[in-house]
Amino acid sequence: MMGKLGVVLFICLVLFPLETLQLEGGQQADRHVDQLEGNPNRETRTIEVRCTTMNCLKGHCGCSPDCGSC
């Protein structure tokens, strides 16, 4: 009887919380992806930052003439 109780307690107190922690981690990652997909300006902002780097100041940035820094 005590052995069965020990197994049940082990499952409830150790294995079940470990499984729920893994699910929460996956949900956090999905939420982060949703935030990135919902923000179309993030990609545009990255392109603008690349256009204003030192390569642009040297004259060989490879971006469009509309860059402003070229």
Curated annotation (Swiss-Prot):
- Which residues belong to the signal peptide in this entry? 1-20
Pfam families xrefs:
Conotoxin
What are the record keywords, sorted?
A: Disulfide bond, Neurotoxin, Secreted, Signal, Toxin
Cite a single GO MF annotation: ion channel inhibitor activity
Tissue expression as described in the entry: Expressed by the venom duct.
Domain of life per record: Eukaryota
Record propeptide residues: 21-50
Q: Which residues form a coiled coil?
A: none
Give the GO cellular component terms, alphabetically: extracellular region
Locations listed in the record: Secreted
- Which Cys-Cys disulfides exist here? C51-C63, C56-C67, C61-C70
Supply the InterPro entries for this chain: Conotoxin
Print the domain comment field.
Answer: The cysteine framework is IX (C-C-C-C-C-C).
Member of which family?
A: Belongs to the conotoxin M superfamily.
Supply the name of the protein. Conotoxin Cl9.1
- Source organism per entry reads Californiconus californicus
